Amino acid sequence: MDHTVKSKTADTVSSPCAVVGVFERRRLSPAAKAVDEASGGAITAALKRGDIEAKPGQTRLLTDLDNVKAARVLLVGLGVERDLDERTYRKAVTAAAQAAQDCGAGEATFYLPEVEVKTRDLAWRVQQLAIGVTGALYRFDDMKSEAETPRKPLKKLALGVADKAEAKVADEALAQGMAVGRGMSLARDLGNLPGNVCTPSYLADQAKALGKRFDKLKVQSLDRKDMKKLGMGALLAVAQGSQEEPRLIAMEWNGGKKDEQPYVLVGKGITFDTGGISLKPGAAMDEMKFDMCGAASVFGTLQAVAEMNLPINVVGVVPASDNMPDGKATRPGDIIQTLSGQTVEVLNTDAEGRLVLCDALTWSERFKPKEIVDIATLTGACIIALGHHRSAVLGNHPPLVKALQDAGETSGDKCWELPLDPEYDEQLKSNFADMANIGGRPAGTITAASFLARFTKRYQWAHLDIAGTAWLTGEQKGATGRPVPLLTRYLMDRAGA
């Protein structure tokens, strides 16, 4: 989607559709007031008639208003003015985007960021507009023979700024928000693809394609032979039941100084998870194509970082594999040696994510990271603990955990810290190996992170469990693109952007 900034008032802007906010109790935003005065009170009249009550997310389309250059004016309800908060603002943006597309304008000029949102500045409001519009209009029709396209899709987003002094800030924020939105779309695309298309090799090809787009992005991909030579026994143990070749993918964004330590993101890339010999129930197993959403978020974040040209060094690492039952598959009770040299008794082959991650986390030490964050759809226990609204965050470095929490609050892609006390680590004891790969039913999210913590003692590390936030079920079934907003905001903060 193209985007631009227009330094025009809502009544003078030449646009197929101008989008303005209205509040309950017939209060108008500055843009709505300008249109109302120019048109002889058309908006006030609509409010008096009850055409729109201005409750959050309500919309009403007005056309051919006198003395207004825009062909259409879309009114968007913002609720009570003094109560306008982040959640209400995002709801209004989503509704506005959908209504702007449905009206067939093809292009819309949004004035919503001019309104005051509690504790948030103009840049935040513009970024959230761009992210919200991109997300609201996202469609995944790639696998359909006949795509259900709108009669006239919204192809251009314009941001209306009445105050020219704010145009520069708005322009930069709009570009940043669009980059995050496109990163989320990439993550959603990868997540929504079926397992017979989005294989480990497919992900490696997508990484190479990203590398060709951006000069500062270096890409490498290790195959089974490379992993065997290195001694990645855990990743290979997961992969050995599948005919699909595993891959370990690294994408290095060199936007900072050559000697600056990079921030490393490690994303779980199980492209389809049957559970292996510890086979999952058949119901809803199709959703296990989403088990690579951690990897997808790394792709989306790296693309956003590259589009924004952030002055920071970032490495994205993706251990990619299927987890399949086969005559060669790992059995419950097998003992494997990880890249770190530690041994693991595999009591449950459906706890495979931590196995591919532990080798990737050890391998990532070669980058001499400043901080490492791993992202994984790791445990169903996380859904029980936090539902589908917040991801879980755990780690060995409180300032890093706090930075991720802050990034989540700012972006709206929120996370919640769970403890990582040493007592939980005792649940991983094995009589036959250094550790077991499961710790029983109690505190499943925490014991999974405790397992990973054994491989991250040499650097500052945090773990994001996105099992409850990476995809939706039901009528809106599909990947969400989370936690791309959180990760991108975290890296922007680290880069001072």
From Swiss-Prot:
Q: How is the cofactor bound?
A: Binds 2 manganese ions per subunit.
Q: Which Gene Ontology terms cover its molecular function?
A: manganese ion binding; metalloaminopeptidase activity
- Give a GO cellular-component term: cytoplasm
Task: Name the InterPro entries for this protein.
Answer: Leucine_aapep/pepB, Macro_dom-like, Peptidase_M17_C, Peptidase_M17_leu_NH2_pept, Peptidase_M17_N
Reaction it catalyzes: Release of an N-terminal amino acid, Xaa-|-Yaa-, in which Xaa is preferably Leu, but may be other amino acids including Pro although not Arg or Lys, and Yaa may be Pro. Amino acid amides and methyl esters are also readily hydrolyzed, but rates on arylamides are exceedingly low; Release of an N-terminal amino acid, preferentially leucine, but not glutamic or aspartic acids
Q: Which residues form a coiled coil?
A: none
Q: Which residues bind Mn(2+) 1?
A: 273, 350, 352
Q: Which residues bind Mn(2+) 2?
A: 268, 273, 291, 352
Q: Which NCBIfam families match?
A: PRK00913.1-2 (NF002073), PRK00913.1-4 (NF002074), PRK00913.2-4 (NF002077)
Q: What is this protein called?
A: Probable cytosol aminopeptidase
Organism name: Alkalilimnicola ehrlichii (strain ATCC BAA-1101 / DSM 17681 / MLHE-1)
Its lineage opens with:
Bacteria, Pseudomonadati, Pseudomonadota, Gammaproteobacteria, Chromatiales
